[in-house]
Amino acid sequence: MRKVVFGGANSLDNYFARKDDAVDWLMWSDEVGKIMADYFKTFDTIVMGRRTYEVAVRSGHGGGSYPGMKTYVFSRTLKPRSTKNLEITSEDVAEVVGRLKQEEGKDICIMGGGLLAKPLFEANLIDEIGFNIHPVLLGSGIPLFHEMNHQIDLELIDCKTLKTGCVLVTYRVKPPAKKSATARSAKSANRARSSRTQTKAK
C-alpha cells in the first residue's frame, strides 16, 4: 500500500503562509534544494487545494502540475479539468485519497495547509508528517493545523538541524488506539448507572 505524506514548511507559530498567501519568509539554500529533490523522488502523486495550486501556477509549475507526477487539485470553485498530469475536482478528498492509496505506485504527497489535511487526518489516511520548521514567528497568517475530531499520536522518525537554522522533522502517524474491552465495559456501566439515576429522578 502506498504511503500518504503530509509535508511542507511552516513558521514556529504554526503558519505556512501569510494572510495574503505570501511565503517570502521561507529560507532557501543549496542544502534545502538537495533535500527537496530527494524528497520528491519518493512521490508520483501530489494532492493540493485551490490556494496552493494557484501559488504553484504563479511560481511557474506548468499549470500547477509537477514533472513526472499526477497532481490532484481539490476545489469547489475552480472549473473541473482532467489531463494526463492534472486533475481538478470537487470530489471528497478523503474518498479520492483513500482510492489512490490502494493503487500501485510511489507515495502520495499532501501539499498545502491544514484545511486540506484535516479530513485526511480524521479518516486516518495520513501515514507520515514531514516539515521544515523555520526560525520565525509570523504573528499571523494561514494556520498549518486546524481543530480535529480526535487526537493524533506521532512517533519521531528523524530530526535534522539545517545550516539556515531550520529544523527538519519527520513523524510517523501512529494508528488510532483500539478501545480495550475493559474501557468498553466501563463505558457501558456508566451508561447503565446514568439511566438508573434518570429513572429514579422521574
Question: What name fits each language-model region?
Answer:
Residues 1-202:
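Enzymes that bind and transform nitrogen-containing heteroaromatic metabolites
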